[in-house]
Amino acid sequence: MRYLEIRIRCQRAAADAVGNLLLTLTGAGYAVDDPLIVEQNRSRWDMTDLPPGDPEWVTVSGWLPEAGDVEQQRLRLETGLDEIRSLGLGAVDPARFRWVEEEDWAHAWKAYFRPTRVGDRLVVVPAWEEYAPQEGELPIRIDPGMAFGTGTHATTALCMRWLEELVTPGSRVIDVGTGSGILAVAAKHLGAAEVVAIDVDPVAVDAARENAGRNGVEIDVRLATLDQVAEGEADLIVANIIASVIVDILPDVASRLKPGGRFLASGIIAARKEAVTEAMTDAWLLPVGAREQDGWVAILAMKP
């Protein structure tokens, strides 16, 4: 089915009235693109590709199904917009229209997820695809669902390539912010004796457990934060999250690593590299290396 997308740019004071008009016409709600929300939160995000916008203006959108009387609804829309303009709430631009196709968003992304070699041995494989590993390959079968990435993003790839060098047989690994569990599965495939995977999101915990089962590995997946994991036991802690959270957990990282243990931190934009490195030093962790890909950085530190 096709839908007629309606986009109306208006001043903030008129947004509620425009939204209510679209709600009445479509019966299915509306969306508001608000640059003020972006600006208020920009400092909290490591990155955003949204350009600054005029905070006095927003864009309100709604969608009409092709099956309805679209032309009649367009006439009702124009009449309604004229009425809103007459109220003097704020300027309302003419509506813009375009046809959009309905897609099965829950499955369309799968067409772009293919087996991908990430390191020398690790290969990320969609759970629904047949794959015959070549000699020496370690396939990781992942179904990320709609909530997690496919494991091929630069932040994850940096971690996986480094894990191939860092994980030793018999080691204990903690994966902080495990998400789909891909790094935990990788560590287990590479020979770790024990892997603890933690996340604060119940959806992530369920996904990680399912992906561990798909790969036939035993992983201790917990709904927990790092301070709830026993101290002084880990040979390696890996965290592919964001810079601000990495900095926040550094004291807990230091107390949970064995002497000589390593901390692998990823999910850091290049602009935050120096700040994270300095924070590691302040937490008595010695930065020993950094690698960059596509503007993202992974930093390796050691507990003396």
From Swiss-Prot:
GO terms, molecular function: protein-lysine N-methyltransferase activity
EC number: 2.1.1.-
GO BP term, example: methylation
Annotated binding of S-adenosyl-L-methionine, by residue: T156, G177, D199, N240
Keywords, ordered alphabetically: Cytoplasm, Methyltransferase, S-adenosyl-L-methionine, Transferase
InterPro entries linked: Ribosomal_L11_MeTrfase_PrmA, Ribosomal_PrmA_MeTrfase, SAM-dependent_MTases_sf
Cell location: Cytoplasm
Xref: HAMAP family: Methyltr_PrmA
Protein name listed in UniProt: Ribosomal protein L11 methyltransferase
Record organism: Symbiobacterium thermophilum (strain DSM 24528 / JCM 14929 / IAM 14863 / T)
